């Protein structure tokens, strides 16, 4: 999103007073704790996720976005969840399974990654619901 010509920050949604939509702190802490318990074989990282209107497959573009917006990852859906939750005063959390770094270093094919991500996500979601 680039509405800088209208006085908004780059990335800011016009007519929105917020530039980013922080996740609920309690949900964030719970997800980090639970993920380490039910999925000890994966790494858990916390930070801003940058959302945009394009699939990023170029390392230079990814690095520029992360540098400019202070993000940890780049994707296409999270901001819509954050915006809807923010506008409706609903606590939210976005959890992402990162398939690759947009630099050719992916260590498994997408079908294999997809199955692992589904398994990890189900374990995380079930345990989080149990603990809420």
Each predicted region: which residue ranges?
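His/Asp/Glu-rich mid-to-C-terminal helical/loop segments that flank catalytic regions of hydrolases
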Residues: 102-132
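A structural motif corresponding to the C-terminal end of an alpha-helix
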Residues: 34-42, 81-90, 124-128
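A C-terminal functional module that forms or caps the active site or interfaces directly
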Residues: 54-107
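Mid-sequence, gly/pro-rich, charge-dense loop/helix-turn segments that line enzyme active sites
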Residues: 1-69
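Conserved active-site and cofactor/substrate-binding residues in soluble primary-metabolism enzymes
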Residues: 22, 26, 60, 76-80, ...
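Hydrophobic transmembrane alpha-helix bundles
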Residues: 4-15, 77-90, 114-120, 132
